Amino acid sequence: MSQSNSDDSASSSTQQAGDGQDDVQQNIVWHAHTVSREDRESKLGQRGVVVWFTGLSGCGKSTIANELDRLLIDRGATCTLLDGDNVRHGLCAPPSVLKEEHGEDFAGRFGLGFGPTDREENIRRIGAVTELFASAGVIVLAAFVSPYQRDRDRVRNTIESSGRAGDFLEVFVDTPLEICKQRDPKGLYQKAIAGEIKNFTGISDPYDAPPSPEIHLKWREGQTPHDQASEIIREMEKRGVLGPAKG
């Protein structure tokens, strides 16, 4: 996930909701749908699940997720891919991106940097989006550093509370930090080590390795993204969250 030093000082959490919305929760009720989740899954012929990739920057999350996306599409599945860098251009954009169009006040309230609270909100937003997709029967691939275990656990609870146990598959892309530093495709580690980027996971910010992920992809010399994506396919089939290929 790309990180920008200029965004670290801005945190939406420091702003108050305001605008007379403090009691809005009292006036919001859940509107039941006529079409159920089961109806949608039956129509698609699949189970809506979230495959959540986590790991250090440069570990291979996005590359493996893209390969898995292709394998799933090729076998007739309906899926979508949410990537950490891409959502920072819209849904979870930093203040610097929002400021020009929406103004400084809006950007300060809703733009997200990379401090602990902003990271928490980033994953909360993504978790809510993945829940919407999964409840529609879509297989969701989410590739995010998501460094804090508590935030990943909250997403898991959101997904499984609205669906079933087992609807959230945590994939730990376990690539050693030294290998990630060597890859450094965006030059971020070099900048972080030089002090040009703050709150960088693995350098100046911690990463909570998953203690018991559903899928643990340990780095092995010579293993390709296709090999790793195929391993995930096999595990999904084994767990009964992915049916046979269609067509």
UniProtKB/Swiss-Prot annotation:
Keywords: ATP-binding, Kinase, Nucleotide-binding, Phosphoprotein, Transferase
GO MF annotation list: adenylylsulfate kinase activity; ATP binding; sulfate adenylyltransferase (ATP) activity
Catalytic activity, EC: 2.7.1.25
GO biological process entries: hydrogen sulfide biosynthetic process; sulfate assimilation, phosphoadenylyl sulfate reduction by phosphoadenylyl-sulfate reductase (thioredoxin)
Gene3D superfamilies: P-loop containing nucleotide triphosphate hydrolases
Reactions mediated catalytically: adenosine 5'-phosphosulfate + ATP = 3'-phosphoadenylyl sulfate + ADP + H(+)
Pathway info: Sulfur metabolism; hydrogen sulfide biosynthesis; sulfite from sulfate: step 2/3
Coiled-coil positions: none
Binding-site residues, ATP: G55, L56, S57, G58, C59, G60, K61, S62
Protein origin, superkingdom: Bacteria
Keyword Protease: no
Location of the active site: S146
Pfam families reported for this sequence: APS_kinase (PF01583)
Enzyme class, UniProt record, top EC level: transferase
Keyword Transferase listed: yes
Region (Disordered): 1-24
InterPro entries with a match to the protein in the record: APS_kinase, P-loop_NTPase, Sulf_AdTrans/APS_kinase
Family (UniProt): Belongs to the APS kinase family.
Biological function: Catalyzes the synthesis of activated sulfate.
HAMAP family, alphabetized: Adenylyl_sulf_kinase
Descriptive protein name: Adenylyl-sulfate kinase
Name of the gene: cysC
